[in-house]
Amino acid sequence: MTDSQTTATETRSPRRRRRLLGGTAASVGLITAMLTAGSLPAQAACEESGQWLFSPETESAESLVSAGPPQSNYNGTGSTASTTFSAQASATVEASVSGSANVSLDAKLASMSATYGTSFSPSLTAGPGNDITIDIPPGQTGNGEYGVYTVTVTGTETLYGPSCEAVESRTSTVTSPVRVGWNTWLS
């Protein structure tokens, strides 16, 4: 403290010092009472508190579940030829879960769709009557396979506490159908 501050403090009357200290104590008491009574806004409640949520982390490439055997046609001519393949059988593929199952399948599929921008379905069917025509160069074989494409997504299920802290985490894998279609290739 400087000399002027010391002098100013020493020249205050004992009565003024009691009043300043009393005012400070009253302010602290008022703030404490307000906090205890809940007069100040409380921290917002965590929406995820007590819930398990699924966070997708890795997505596989599409894989085809075939509806019947592959079809083939050899072009033994000297020019390009067209061939038409027709689906003869049907296949229904349903989504499956391995690992942790604290989050519903519907909630996992919704989270996956939002993350990857793909429509993940609980079930899709590839049926007969679907045709595709391809061009086959001379001396090559055209091949076609019809069915349901699936994608496998691995992610983490997390249980959240009252302050939105992760309380527990578990791995979960979902394989889901994403579309029906043909795979064609030349050999």
What are these regions (language model features)?
Residues 1, 20-21, 27, 36, ...:
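Intrinsically disordered, low-complexity segments enriched in small/polar residues
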